[in-house]
């Protein structure tokens, strides 16, 4: 049975939109990492630069390379010994390499290698996995899904040319980044087209504005977990291979059930 991977979010920033400052100290971050492991997480994604609404392309100007290193490296060094895969959410190859040297095995690049052209070489050198997220400035000359596919496949091709195997390249449609609400609806409705590329797909909707608008009511980020879980179920039915979430326990339980139901359906449709 194919298992949907649960990527738990561990923001070690003072200003992330959902949990900024909550895990800013190493001790707090380690405690949360242990909780996520107990809850069944497959991958812990450590991020040192906020991607809250409005940050987009200015993040690298507001947080220096040195500051990002100071936030991320002590946490990574403290949790990489645990029996769980560690990912680092960064668009800087210097941060990626420093973390890969410590034993990290995945880099989650919100700019898909467009910000730092050396990212693919670094990830390839360490035999790691990479997540390529669709991003941009919101201006496009073709419909959103077509533009997303062209952009992500171009970057995935560069990653493969750098020596990263196909099965270690994840694609993330970038819900919450450089898209209107209608464009996000279009991307969600056509997730199967991204899945059809045969790269593993990671869906990251957790607690985002998209969830708030889907609920059609004012809500704090932590009140959006059940609706986030609905997108997890939907994504699994569409064929995504992983989800990036804040509430690990809820999504782990849901994913286990969805995986069982999908496997059950497959087996019964393929009985000889």
From Swiss-Prot:
Binding-site positions, Mg(2+): 11
NCBIfam families membership: DHPS
Gene3D superfamilies linked: Dihydropteroate synthase-like
Domain Pterin-binding: 1-251
EC number: 2.5.1.15
Organism: Staphylococcus epidermidis (strain ATCC 35984 / DSM 28319 / BCRC 17069 / CCUG 31568 / BM 3577 / RP62A)
Gene Ontology, cellular component aspect: cytosol
Principal EC category: transferase
GO biological process, one term: folic acid biosynthetic process
Entry keywords, A to Z: Folate biosynthesis, Magnesium, Metal-binding, Transferase
Gene Ontology molecular-function annotations: dihydropteroate synthase activity; metal ion binding
Subunit structure, interactors included: Homodimer.
Recorded family membership: Belongs to the DHPS family.
Protein name: Dihydropteroate synthase
Annotated catalysed reactions: (7,8-dihydropterin-6-yl)methyl diphosphate + 4-aminobenzoate = 7,8-dihydropteroate + diphosphate
Pathway assignment: Cofactor biosynthesis; tetrahydrofolate biosynthesis; 7,8-dihydrofolate from 2-amino-4-hydroxy-6-hydroxymethyl-7,8-dihydropteridine diphosphate and 4-aminobenzoate: step 1/2
InterPro entries to which the protein is assigned, alphabetical: DHP_synth-like, DHP_synth_dom, Dihydropteroate_synth-like_sf, Pterin-binding_dom
Cited PROSITE patterns: DHPS_1, DHPS_2, PTERIN_BINDING
Binding annotation for (7,8-dihydropterin-6-yl)methyl diphosphate: 51, 89, 108, 172, 208, 244-246
Cofactor: Mg(2+)
Keyword Nucleus found: no
Any coiled-coil regions, as ranges: none
Function: Catalyzes the condensation of para-aminobenzoate (pABA) with 6-hydroxymethyl-7,8-dihydropterin diphosphate (DHPt-PP) to form 7,8-dihydropteroate (H2Pte), the immediate precursor of folate derivatives.
CDD domains documented for this protein: DHPS (cd00739)
Paired cysteines (S-S): none
């Amino acid at each position: 049975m194919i298992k949907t991977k649960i990527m738990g979010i561990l923001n070690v920033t003072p200003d992330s939109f959902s949990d900024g400052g909550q895990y800013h100290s190493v001790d707090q971050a380690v405690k949360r990492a242990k909780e996520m492991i107990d809850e069944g997480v497959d991958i812990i994604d450590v991020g040192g630069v906020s991607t809250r609404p409005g940050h987009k392309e200015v993040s690298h100007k507001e947080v220096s390379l040195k500051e990002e290193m100071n936030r991320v490296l002590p946490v990574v060094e403290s949790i990489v010994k645990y029996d769980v895969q560690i990912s680092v959410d960064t668009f800087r190859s210097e941060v990626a390499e420093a973390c890969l040297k410590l034993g990290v095995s995945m880099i989650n690049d919100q700019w898909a290698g467009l910000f730092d052209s050396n990212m693919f070489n670094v990830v390839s050198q360490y035999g790691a996995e990479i997540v390529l997220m669709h991003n941009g400035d919101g201006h496009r000359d073709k419909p959103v899904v077509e533009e997303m596919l062209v952009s992500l496949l171009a970057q995935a091709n560069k990653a493969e040319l750098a020596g990263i195997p196909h099965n270690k390249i994840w694609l993330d449609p970038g819900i919450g980044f450089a898209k209107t609400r209608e464009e996000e609806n279009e991307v969600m409705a056509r997730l199967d087209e991204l899945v059809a590329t045969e790269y593993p797909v990671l869906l990251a909707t957790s607690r985002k504005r998209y969830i708030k608008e889907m609920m059609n009511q004012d809500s704090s980020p932590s009140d959006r977990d059940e609706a986030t879980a609905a997108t997890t179920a939907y994504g699994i039915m569409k064929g995504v291979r992983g989800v990036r979430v804040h509430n690990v326990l809820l999504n782990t339980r849901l994913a286990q059930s969805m995986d069982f139901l999908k496997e059950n359906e497959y087996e019964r449709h393929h009985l000889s």
